[in-house]
């Protein structure tokens, strides 16, 4: 789950995979939080972390400026709210794109909605640098809901299927949803972001 190596304009990329337990009526984890560094728990104890959350896992209000965040939800639920007044509850297959620009405060929490079963949560988050002239553009928030995102199916030589969800740019002639108005112009013409599902042993 540690950040991956990136190159400009990508500032940061991290993969979160947490096998959260059943939730309570307040969407907090069932059981004790003893042994965790509450407020900064990245322990992966029992297969999951609280991160900066104190009752509900996740990342309470914190600031960003001068770059963009792209959050790709693979499994579970994410609750977003920010200083622009935007809120969203999104999950499996949805993508959130936020341009921090001149500054925004937001939170990303992982509510444990299911009381009768576990609440596994998986997501990728990418930070995308803005060029100097766009560092202080107006903040912007948008959602790419799962049904609006192109998915390309790819078969290998043994007819095993991979799927490519096109989040930004293009893949195999299919385009991603329209990006925010002030996204990095250095990024989109030359690169793409895709979420790819590959079966174990498959070639892509």
Feature-to-residue mapping (PLM):
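Jelly-roll (double-stranded beta-helix
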Residues: 1-204
């Amino acid at each position: 789950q540690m950040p991956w190596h990136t190159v400009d304009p990508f500032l940061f990329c991290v993969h979160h995979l947490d096998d959260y337990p059943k939730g309570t009526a307040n969407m907090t984890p069932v059981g004790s939080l003893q042994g965790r560094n509450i407020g900064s728990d990245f322990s992966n104890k029992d297969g999951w972390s609280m991160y900066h959350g104190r009752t509900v896992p996740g990342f309470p209000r914190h600031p960003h400026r001068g770059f963009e965040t792209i959050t790709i939800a693979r499994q579970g639920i994410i609750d977003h709210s920010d200083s622009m007044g935007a809120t969203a509850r999104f999950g499996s297959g949805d993508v959130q794109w936020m341009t921090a620009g001149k500054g925004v405060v937001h939170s990303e929490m992982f509510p444990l909605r299911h009381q009768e079963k576990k609440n596994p949560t998986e997501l990728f988050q990418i930070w995308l640098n803005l060029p100097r002239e766009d560092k202080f553009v107006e903040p912007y928030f948008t959602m790419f809901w799962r049904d609006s995102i192109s998915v390309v199916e790819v078969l290998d030589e043994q007819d095993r299927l991979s799927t490519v969800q096109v989040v930004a740019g293009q893949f195999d002639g299919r385009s991603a949803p329209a990006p925010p108005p002030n996204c990095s112009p250095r990024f989109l013409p030359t690169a793409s972001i895709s979420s790819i599902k590959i079966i174990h042993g498959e070639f892509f």
